[in-house]
């Protein structure tokens, strides 16, 4: 693929814009569906998009070979994403204000550096510890709305689930380091494995229902713009980029843009502690990113 920085930035900005809308979309969708139902229907839409994408670009023929080469790895990945990760994440969004849940979700990169120590044998440097302290201080500020000395959490379970989702996502990426298959092929296989697990749990809980039109639209939006199209746009941005660092830095726009959508469409009053805490989280991520780029 020919490199083109302008095209890369356009792809990246499109992805960032769409990712910035999903926190709002999650909350709107959860007004229509339970977290488990949303995981299933959104994953189904994402699976359909990925299947069509692979058929169009000719990569569908490699799916079977990729799966058979490492079935146990794909089983682990598929259980993690979409099944466990999104189920836990959507439950966190169900319990927390969108502004809190989306901010806490951005700490997954810090969770990744923590898990990489025991699982990949990496060392935790002083800069990693500094990044960790900044990020989790931000988590504390957001979770307690600035009253962190009192440790008065609005929803301890919601905060716990949001942080657990970051560990699950970090775990997914650590397992993915062993995978050399094309990203879209890998993601399609994961969704092909994850969907039956979600369906089994839905059946076990007798939670099937025919969605309303609003619920279908909400699930389609989440499936396409959180799990499907946006992922492909970001991959295109990385492939087109002449300077990947400058393109990948655009992701830092997303959490703040997301707050605008949350305020506009959900009517949530953005608490000052959310902005301050998010600033600490972004500082932590920036420290981590700057050190890795050296």
What do the predicted segments below correspond to?
Residues 32-84, 111-115, 167-172, 188-205, ...:
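Transmembrane alpha-helices of multi-pass small-molecule transport proteins
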